[in-house]
Amino acid sequence: MSQDELDQIRAKIQDHLISSGNYELINKQLKLKLYENGWYDKVGQLATTELQQEDNKNLTFERLYAMVKPQAESMVPDEVRQEIMTRIREYLEDVIQ
């Protein structure tokens, strides 16, 4: 399967997720779980630490985002990641059947 075909399939799934309302439900669940686990606070602290470093005084948002994003993604608790992935898999299994 070509990359173009994979991109088309991904776009169709995303469109269906949005139109069915499942995207909003999964997104809300993810945000709630991240909030409950203190992820937003931890990422905020990480960004603040980066901004306070002397060599980052003129840091742009885009550069700060690029610096913090990999660490922020790795800080998502495994149980949250697994729970959301399970919801997505269940949704896909329903759609494919």
Curated annotation (Swiss-Prot):
Record's keyword annotation contains Protein transport: yes
- One GO MF term, please? transcription coactivator activity
Keyword vocabulary terms for this entry: Activator, Chromatin regulator, Cytoplasm, mRNA transport, Nucleus, Protein transport, Transcription, Transcription regulation, Translocation, Transport
Q: Which residues form a coiled coil?
A: none
Sorted alphabetically, the Gene Ontology cellular component annotations on this record are:
DUBm complex; nuclear pore; nucleoplasm; P-body; SAGA complex; transcription export complex 2
Location (main, coarse): nucleus
Q: Which InterPro entries match?
A: TF_ENY2, TF_EnY2_sf
Q: Which GO terms describe its biological process?
A: chromatin organization; mRNA export from nucleus; protein transport; transcription elongation by RNA polymerase II
Look up the domain of life of the source: Eukaryota
The keyword Iron appears for this protein:
no
Q: Where in the cell is it found?
A: Nucleus, Nucleoplasm; Cytoplasm, P-body
List, alphabetically, the Pfam families matched: EnY2
Q: What does the subunit section of this Swiss-Prot or TrEMBL entry state? A: Component of the nuclear pore complex (NPC)-associated TREX-2 complex (transcription and export complex 2), composed of at least SUS1, SAC3, THP1, SEM1, and CDC31. TREX-2 contains 2 SUS1 chains. The TREX-2 complex interacts with the nucleoporin NUP1. Component of the 1.8 MDa SAGA transcription coactivator-HAT complex. SAGA is built of 5 distinct domains with specialized functions. Within the SAGA complex, SUS1, SGF11, SGF73 and UBP8 form an additional subcomplex of SAGA called the DUB module (deubiquitination module). Interacts directly with THP1, SAC3, SGF11, and with the RNA polymerase II.
Family per record: Belongs to the ENY2 family.
Function according to Swiss-Prot or TrEMBL: Involved in mRNA export coupled transcription activation by association with both the TREX-2 and the SAGA complexes. At the promoters, SAGA is required for recruitment of the basal transcription machinery. It influences RNA polymerase II transcriptional activity through different activities such as TBP interaction and promoter selectivity, interaction with transcription activators, and chromatin modification through histone acetylation and deubiquitination.
Task: Please identify the protein, giving its name as recorded.
Answer: Transcription and mRNA export factor SUS1
